[in-house]
Amino acid sequence: MKTFKGVASAKDMRVAIVGACFNGPIADALVSGAQQTFLDLGGAEDMLTVVRVPGSFEIPCTLKKLLTSGVKYDAIVACGVLIKGETTHYDHIADQVSARISELSLEFNLPITFSVITAPCIDSAWQRAGIKGSNLGISGMKTALEMADLFKKL
């Protein structure tokens, strides 16, 4: 029996981060966490592309643009922050962004991690951005690198 498992190493990996700017300081914490993790795990700055988009809704179309650009990425990390408000806007955006990221990952057979915070309130969002707890940008980058390594082994 063969068992395959990826290792979270950025050495020789070409990775992109697509990060939304909306909900600025929280979104910035996710992108910064992902960037620093890439470097801490042996990645070279010239192998990391960071693209900032206005909001989370713009993440999927930007992912598709990167995926069809001719540059071969090993993985992509999608970072954004959606905080529930009083209308249904949050539900529509969260559902569509999540579904499209998953579809693109399957269509292009590439690890694209979902580091988009979907939180009921700003305090919960901060908890997922590393200020009061874990950082989804960090865990998203680690998962992306582990999956990229696994895909190379399969």
Swiss-Prot record:
Keyword Mitochondrion: no
Reactions listed under catalytic activity: (2S)-2-hydroxy-3-oxobutyl phosphate + 5-amino-6-(D-ribitylamino)uracil = 6,7-dimethyl-8-(1-D-ribityl)lumazine + phosphate + 2 H2O + H(+)
EC number of this enzyme: 2.5.1.78
Active-site residue numbers: H89 (proton donor)
Keywords of the record: Riboflavin biosynthesis, Transferase
One GO-annotated biological process of the protein: riboflavin biosynthetic process
Coiled coil segments of this chain: none
Pfam families with a match to the protein in the record: DMRL_synthase
Broad class of enzyme this protein falls into: transferase
Binding of 5-amino-6-(D-ribitylamino)uracil, residues: F22, S56, F57, E58, V81, L82, I83, F114
Main function: Catalyzes the formation of 6,7-dimethyl-8-ribityllumazine by condensation of 5-amino-6-(D-ribitylamino)uracil with 3,4-dihydroxy-2-butanone 4-phosphate. This is the penultimate step in the biosynthesis of riboflavin.
Name of the protein described by the UniProt record: 6,7-dimethyl-8-ribityllumazine synthase
Gene name per UniProt: ribH
